[in-house]
Swiss-Prot record:
Biological source species: Rhodopseudomonas palustris (strain BisA53)
Statement: the UniProt record of this protein carries the keyword Ribonucleoprotein: no
Function statement: Key enzyme in the regulation of glycerol uptake and metabolism. Catalyzes the phosphorylation of glycerol to yield sn-glycerol 3-phosphate.
Top-level taxonomy: Bacteria, Pseudomonadati, Pseudomonadota, Alphaproteobacteria, Hyphomicrobiales
Catalyzed chemical reaction(s): glycerol + ATP = sn-glycerol 3-phosphate + ADP + H(+)
Gene3D superfamilies: 3.30.420.40
Binding-site residues for sn-glycerol 3-phosphate, renumbered to this chain: 11, 81-82, 133, 242
Domain of life the protein comes from: Bacteria
One cellular component term from this protein's GO annotations in UniProt: cytosol
Protein name per UniProt: Glycerol kinase
Length: 500
């Protein structure tokens, strides 16, 4: 039997999972690390914390599985996307804490770029919008704010990497400075049509080319780990950003297949095949994966509040003590009430992209109580997913010819109530997989594919296992009434926006 180690480096913790060659899990290790908030809207990580927690969990998972380095056929890496690290090419010392994807410190830089009219060019080349979320403006901030950084970068003394790239550099003992196309596509510097770093974008954002890593396929030879780390060298054969890795772990290899991951927020990706689809509905166009030099593209939409709406019920209102209570409580709601929660606690994500809005409840009556609030909170996740679903169908020209298949993962999918309501509102089946560790599985698959122990994508897809399919059971009239009410609630909230 062969084994693959998947490194899943997330925003709040690092995880390592050992998969057997039959895709079953042999061991899991997890370690949380500190978050740093030095100013309002700023979020940072210590690069050494990212590295030490990754190394510790990798060692623990291998030991827990009763294995040694020579038993591991390959390592796959998946990571929090867009987070930026700059480090010294010789010493490996980071010049600053990592700036995390959630960080908003470059808002003014982004506003200036927009006001100067650069967004159409950036969107055309990268598929992204100008937003502090992405890596490019974070790199510029570090070069300009850390004393001497820009001069050092111009002299070729510094390296940039997203978290995957930084971990790869550390794992290989500083021998390999590389990333994959999915991570590169989130930087604002990578042309998703040519598959290259773009000179015009580098000049626009004032980023020296010498900082940037080599861009490889998602399943490729990324070198080997330093033999001193695990008691022997292990080949590193796969890399993908976390949402793309989940898309792969869900075996969404065919155009029209969509995965939606429900955690604190929600990220949905729709495979659109070999041609990038331009969005007219404020979705992102991104690279789903790159295999054998061939890029597969996706439309991506993000929802800021999904599971955090349930956390609000628990921590903010105190009407539940555990997330699992939400569905049964929602079941007790008064069916004659139409309460809508628009959970814009930190603004609305796709397809609205309005950071200024704040949450609101609509349809309250004297009889509205905890059950109705639980009902509204869970339904809000389904309504927001419907908005993404509708935007993707509108953007993708083949939507009428192909049935979109939705596969879900993440902690919130444990709620049967929510998944059934999602199927009802979409009027489409919702598939929950047997293996919930889809992000790590995607990284493991990419590594195992390159190492020759996992099959080609189609065969892997054939082996994908369904745990439960939720089928729509709501009447068309009820669905239409509910969606009309949601649209009215969103319009009502949008009307409160007075601009910046």
């Amino acid at each position: 039997m062969s084994f693959v180690l998947a490194i899943d480096q997330g925003t709040t913790s690092s995880r390592a999972i050992v998969f057997r060659d039959d895709i079953s899990i042999a061991a899991v290790a997890q370690q949380e690390f500190s978050q740093h908030f030095p100013a309002s809207g700023w979020v940072e990580h210590e690069p050494e914390d990212i590295w030490s927690s990754t190394l510790a969990t990798s060692r623990a998972a291998i030991e827990q599985a009763g294995l040694k380095a020579s038993d591991i056929a390959a390592i796959g890496i998946t990571n929090q996307r867009e987070t930026v690290v700059l480090w010294d090419r010789v010493t490996g010392q980071a010049i600053h804490r990592a700036i995390v994807w959630q960080d908003r410190r470059t808002s003014e830089i982004c506003a200036r770029l927009k006001s100067e009219g650069h967004e159409p060019l950036i969107t055309q080349k990268t598929g992204l919008i100008i937003d502090p979320y992405f890596s490019g403006t974070k790199i510029g901030w570090l070069l300009d704010q850390v004393p001497g950084a820009r001069a050092r970068a111009e002299r070729g003394e510094l390296l940039f990497g997203t978290v995957d790239c930084y971990l790869l550099w550390r794992l290989t003992g500083g021998k390999i400075h590389a990333t994959d196309a999915t991570n590169a596509s989130r930087t604002l510097l990578f042309n998703i049509h040519t598959g290259q770093w773009d000179a015009e974008l580098l000049a626009l954002l004032n980023v020296p080319r010498s900082l940037l890593p080599e861009v490889k396929d998602s399943s490729a030879d990324f070198g080997t780990s330093d033999q001193n780390l695990f008691g022997g060298s292990i080949a590193i054969r796969g890399i993908a950003g976390d949402q793309q890795a989940a898309t792969i772990g869900q075996a969404c290899f065919a155009p029209g297949m969509m995965k939606s991951t429900y955690g604190t927020g929600c990220f949905a990706l729709l495979n659109t095949g070999s041609t990038p689809v331009k969005s007219n509905n404020k979705l992102l166009t991104t690279i789903a994966y790159q295999l054998n030099g061939q890029r597969t593209y996706a439309l991506e939409g993000s929802i800021f509040v999904a599971g955090s709406a349930v956390q609000w019920l628990r921590d903010g209102l105190g009407i539940i003590s555990h997330a699992s209570e939400t569905g049964p409580l929602a079941d007790k709601s008064d069916s004659t009430q139409s309460v809508y929660l628009v959970p814009a606690f930190v603004g609305l994500g796709a397809p609205y992209w309005n950071p200024r809005l704040r949450g609101a409840l609509f349809g309250l009556t004297r009889n509205t109580g905890p059950a109705e609030l639980a009902h509204a909170a869970l339904e809000s996740v389904c309504y927001q997913t419907f908005d993404l679903w509708a935007a993707m169908r509108a953007d993708w020209p083949d939507a009428d010819e192909a049935s979109i298949v939705l596969r879900v993962d993440g902690g919130m999918t444990a709620s049967d109530w929510t998944m059934q309501r999602l199927a009802d509102l979409l009027d489409a089946p919702v598939d929950r997989p047997m293996i919930q560790e889809t992000t790590a599985l995607g990284a493991a698959y990419l590594a195992g594919l390159s190492a020759g122990i996992f099959p080609e994508p189609q065969q892997f897809a054939d082996n994908w296992r369904l745990q439960h399919r939720f089928k729509p059971s709501m009447s068309a009239a009820t669905r239409a009434r509910k969606l009309k009410g949601w649209a009215a609630a969103v319009r009502g909230l949008l009307a409160t926006d007075e601009g910046e």
